[in-house]
């Protein structure tokens, strides 16, 4: 993100470090689901949780050779592991990791926006009460009309924003998700339980 157009908190969501961290979270949680199915030993999942690391520059070095971002990522992570590295990316395809991680990153960004929207709507509500008895000129067709209350204008903005937040939450529910369904997306090698 361009720093002058973003706050540090939001910029931090979209760093390469956080992106690859989200990839790793997806990889580990998928392995944990496989473990619940009895495929991956629980102790190997614990090793993935405690030992798996990556270095962004190392990922880029490997990507120069592989010309594939996820292959580079999984190899870089595997370098930090022992025998348990065989479970990295088990039953997954690249889009399983990328799409699910992107949903997670969007959720992080939306959580920042949620706080801002809540703070904003509280200000609108406060102003509506503060100015409930303050007269102002009403308008119709862009010209002066009858007297109205400035607080009413704030209340209308509040109500409009409340509806906007409802729409935001509906959209967020759609994008704060992912999918883990295997190589061609048909669950042929990866059961739906791993996704759920």
Language model region names:
Residues 1-196:
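A helix-coil-helix interface module used to build multimeric assemblies
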């Amino acid at each position: 993100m361009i720093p002058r157009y973003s706050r540090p908190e939001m910029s931090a969501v979209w760093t390469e470090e956080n992106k690859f961290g989200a990839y790793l979270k997806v990889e580990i949680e998928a392995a944990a689901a496989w473990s619940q199915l009895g495929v991956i030993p629980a102790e190997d999942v614990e090793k993935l949780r405690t030992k798996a690391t990556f270095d962004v520059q190392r990922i880029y070095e490997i990507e120069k050779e592989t010309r594939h971002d996820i292959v580079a990522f999984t190899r870089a992570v595997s370098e930090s592991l022992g025998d348990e590295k065989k479970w990295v990316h088990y039953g997954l395809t690249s889009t399983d990791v990328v799409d699910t991680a992107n949903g997670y990153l969007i959720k992080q960004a939306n959580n920042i926006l949620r706080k801002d929207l809540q703070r904003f709507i509280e200000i609108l509500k406060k102003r509506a009460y503060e100015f409930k008895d303050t007269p102002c000129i009403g308008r119709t067709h862009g010209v002066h009309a009858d007297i109205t209350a400035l607080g009413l204008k704030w209340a209308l903005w509040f109500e409009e924003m409340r509806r906007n937040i409802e729409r935001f939450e509906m959209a967020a529910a759609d994008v704060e998700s992912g999918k883990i369904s295997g190589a061609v997306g048909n669950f042929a090698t990866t059961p739906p339980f791993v996704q759920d």
